[in-house]
Amino acid sequence: MAKEELIEFGGVVSEALPDNRYRVLLENGVEIWAYASGKMQKHRIRILAGDRVTLEMSPYDLTKGRINFRHKS
């Protein structure tokens, strides 16, 4: 079975929550829950409220996502 294509979005972190979880406001105005990807956790990349991020979402659940890049401010 082939791996499903992920949908990529941009957004701004509105709130940092415990356990590497974040509330992100997407460019289209929808607010979702997101978590930091494994490489970001491994390299201890800090994500704070107000950071611009790129995240991936599954086409099956558009309420959760995985942050895979933090843009430089």
UniProtKB/Swiss-Prot annotation:
Primary location: cytoplasm
One example GO MF annotation: translation initiation factor activity
Segments forming domain S1-like: 1-72
Record bears the keyword RNA-binding: yes
Localization: Cytoplasm
CDD domains xref list: S1_IF1
Chain ranges passing through the membrane: none
Coiled-coil portions: none
Keywords: Cytoplasm, Initiation factor, Protein biosynthesis, RNA-binding, rRNA-binding
Cellular component terms (Gene Ontology): cytosol
Pfam families in the record: eIF-1a
Family: Belongs to the IF-1 family.
Its job: One of the essential components for the initiation of protein synthesis. Stabilizes the binding of IF-2 and IF-3 on the 30S subunit to which N-formylmethionyl-tRNA(fMet) subsequently binds. Helps modulate mRNA selection, yielding the 30S pre-initiation complex (PIC). Upon addition of the 50S ribosomal subunit IF-1, IF-2 and IF-3 are released leaving the mature 70S translation initiation complex.
Subunit relationships: Component of the 30S ribosomal translation pre-initiation complex which assembles on the 30S ribosome in the order IF-2 and IF-3, IF-1 and N-formylmethionyl-tRNA(fMet); mRNA recruitment can occur at any time during PIC assembly.
Protein name (Swiss-Prot/TrEMBL): Translation initiation factor IF-1 1
Organism of provenance: Cupriavidus pinatubonensis (strain JMP 134 / LMG 1197) (Cupriavidus necator (strain JMP 134))
Gene: infA1
